[in-house]
Amino acid sequence: MSDEGSRGSRLPLALPPASQGCSSGGGGGGSSAGGSGNSRPPRNLQGLLQMAITAGSEEPDPPPEPMSEERRQWLQEAMSAAFRGQREEVEQMKSCLRVLSQPMPPTAGEAEQAADQQEREGALELLADLCENMDNAADFCQLSGMHLLVGRYLEAGAAGLRWRAAQLIGTCSQNVAAIQEQVLGLGALRKLLRLLDRDACDTVRVKALFAISCLVREQEAGLLQFLRLDGFSVLMRAMQQQVQKLKVKSAFLLQNLLVGHPEHKGTLCSMGMVQQLVALVRTEHSPFHEHVLGALCSLVTDFPQGVRECREPELGLEELLRHRCQLLQQHEEYQEELEFCEKLLQTCFSSPADDSMDR
C-alpha cells in the first residue's frame, strides 16, 4: 500500500440512536407506518436484519418477494459475524496496548530483552495492520494509543520500535484531520523531525518522513508547526543524504508542499533553496533528479524571485539544463525529467522580456 493510499471503513461498533427530531413534537402521527422518512433507524442486530429484509418494500413495482428462511438465516449469520469481527478487532487493539504499556524490563538478560522487544514489535505491527481501517484508527486513539506511541515509542532504545511507532502514527494520521490534530497536539512533529534529521537507522528516518508527510500535507496546522520547527531545512538535509529512498521521498514532499502552498516560496528562496536544489541536480544522475527538478519548477512558477535566482550566472543552470536535455533525449524512462528541464529553460531563459520578471 502506498503511503497516501486509499483506506477502508467499516460499520460502526454501535448503531446510532433514533433521531430526537423524529420522535419529538407533532404527536403520534409521525410514527405511523405510512412514511419511510419517519421510520426509526434500527437499534440492534435484529432491527437491522428486519430493515434489510423490508428494504425496497415500498416500491410499487415490482412487489417484493418474501425472503426464504434459508436466506434469512444466512443474512443474520453474516451480519452477526460482521459485528463480532468489529468487537474482536477492538479487543485485539486492547491486547496490543496492554503489551505496549508494560514497563521495559530493567535488568533482564539478553534473551529476555530480545523476546520482550519481539513481542512489542509484533504488537506494533498488528496495530498497523488494524489501523489501515479508519474506524480502527479512531478507536486506537480513543484508547489512548497515540499518547503511548508519542510518549514512549518514538524515543525507544530499539530502532525496530522507533520505526514501527513512526509508521503507525503515519498510518493512523493520513487523511484524518481529527487524528492529525491529536498527534500534533502531543508534540509528535518535533520528535519526528528529530528522527528524520539525526537517527542512525535509515529505516527510522524513512518512516519518520512518512509520518511527517501525513501530518503536513493538506493540514494547515501541521504545516505551520513544520515551518516553526524549521522543517524545510530538515527536508533539504534529508535530500543530501546517500539513502535513495529518503532522497526521493523528501524531494517529492517538497514539491508537493510548493504546489499546495506557493505562499512559502519566498521563505524557501531566502533559505538558499534554489542554489541547493541546483547543487543536487549536479550530482551523479539518478531518478531522484526528476523530483528535484520538479521542486525547482514549482519554485519558479509564477514567482519572479525564483526565476531571478535561477538566472544567476554563477549557478550555470542554463548550460546544465541544456546538457541534461541532450542526455535524456533518447531515454523514454526519463521523459518527465526531460519535461521539467524544458519547462525550466522556457521559464527562466527563453523569455524575450527579461525585465518584466523584475517587476
Curated annotation (Swiss-Prot):
One Gene Ontology term of the biological-process aspect is: protein folding
> What keywords does the record list, in alphabetical order?
Phosphoprotein, Repeat
Task: Write down any Gene Ontology CC term.
Answer: endoplasmic reticulum
Which tissues is it found in, per the record? Ubiquitous.
- Pfam families (alphabetical): Fes1
Q: Where are the ARM repeats?
A: 132-174, 177-217, 220-259, 262-301
Listed Gly residues bias regions: 23-37
Region: Disordered; residue ranges are 1-71
Phosphoserine occurs at S351, S356
Signal peptide as annotated in the record: none
Note the superkingdom of the native organism. Eukaryota
Q: GO MF terms on file?
A: adenyl-nucleotide exchange factor activity; enzyme inhibitor activity; molecular sequestering activity; ubiquitin protein ligase binding
Q: What does this protein do?
A: Inhibits HSPA1A chaperone activity by changing the conformation of the ATP-binding domain of HSPA1A and interfering with ATP binding. Interferes with ubiquitination mediated by STUB1 and inhibits chaperone-assisted degradation of immature CFTR.
Q: How does it assemble?
A: Interacts with the ATP-binding domain of HSPA1A. Detected in a ternary complex containing STUB1, HSPA1A and HSPBP1. Interacts with PGLYRP1; this interaction blocks the cytotoxic activity of the PGLYRP1-HSPA1A complex.
| Name of this protein | Hsp70-binding protein 1
